[in-house]
From Swiss-Prot:
Sequence motif BH3, location on chain: 86-100
Gene Ontology BP annotations: apoptotic process; apoptotic process in bone marrow cell; cellular response to alkaloid; cellular response to amino acid stimulus; cellular response to astaxanthin; cellular response to cAMP; cellular response to dexamethasone stimulus; cellular response to erythropoietin
Motif (BH4): 4-24
Protein name: Bcl-2-like protein 1
A molecular function GO annotation: MDM2/MDM4 family protein binding
CDD domains: Bcl-2_like
Length: 233
């Protein structure tokens, strides 16, 4: 599922950049085409020294890319729901998360004072704090939203080179640290069941449903994410 996870990261970051008037294609070729969408490139192994502070890039061979046959049993259940549905659910959940924390979210990445030389350390510290007490779907949404905001902040500050790096860091963390939990909790199918089909928009119309499952995870994730950021110098 590693390549599919990377596809989710690229799609989400592309979406967030487009909301600010930027195009993913402006930045996907910045560092040797390392962050192109997976359906356009063959899996590559990242050179550890190529990115400041970036851990080795692990791309497992996956028959799941682009609907290829020969799926392993661990992937079958998750592929029942099309990748497009997962992407859409992530976009909607990310928008809802940012809407709820718009005021704080507008400044959160600027608190890090990132530079190309310190960006990975900042990313790692914030993400480790976010998941320090465990993983849930709300925190996974916060993880994606943080990465998107960090990319936008990088471009705004003319550090476009960081966009491809952030995409790689996110995909690596997702594969190495979050994928086991995702598999154990129903896969992305479960995420789509909870957050898909415009659930974020519908939840604003029906507060009882919203408070029951969405707000709990999102609020905790928001508090953890914002707290970890604003507690930093």
């Amino acid at each position: 599922m590693s390549q599919s996870n990377r596809e989710l990261v690229v799609d989400f970051l592309s979406y967030k950049l487009s909301q600010k008037g930027y195009s993913w294609s402006q930045f996907s070729d910045v560092e040797e085409n390392r962050t192109e969408a997976p359906e356009e490139t063959e899996p590559e192994r990242e050179t550890p020294s190529a990115i400041n502070g970036n851990p080795s890039w692990h791309l497992a061979d996956s028959p799941a890319v682009n609907g290829a046959t020969g799926h392993s049993s661990s992937l079958d259940a998750r592929e029942v729901i099309p990748m497009a549905a997962v992407k859409q659910a992530l976009r909607e959940a990310g928008d809802e998360f940012e809407l709820r924390y718009r005021r704080a979210f507008s400044d959160l990445t600027s608190q890090l004072h990132i530079t190309p030389g310190t960006a990975y350390q900042s990313f790692e510290q914030v993400v480790n704090e976010l998941f320090r007490d465990g993983v849930n779907w709300g925190r996974i949404v916060a993880f994606f939203s943080f990465g998107g905001a960090l990319c936008v902040e990088s471009v705004d500050k003319e550090m476009q080179v960081l966009v491809s790096r952030i995409a790689s860091w996110m995909a690596t963390y997702l594969n190495d640290h979050l994928e086991p939990w995702i598999q154990e909790n129903g896969g992305w199918d479960t995420f789509v069941d909870l957050y898909g089909n415009n659930a974020a928009a519908e939840s604003r119309k029906g507060q009882e449903r919203f408070n029951r499952w969405f707000l709990t995870g999102m609020t905790v994730a928001g508090v953890v994410l914002l707290g970890s950021l604003f507690s930093r110098k």
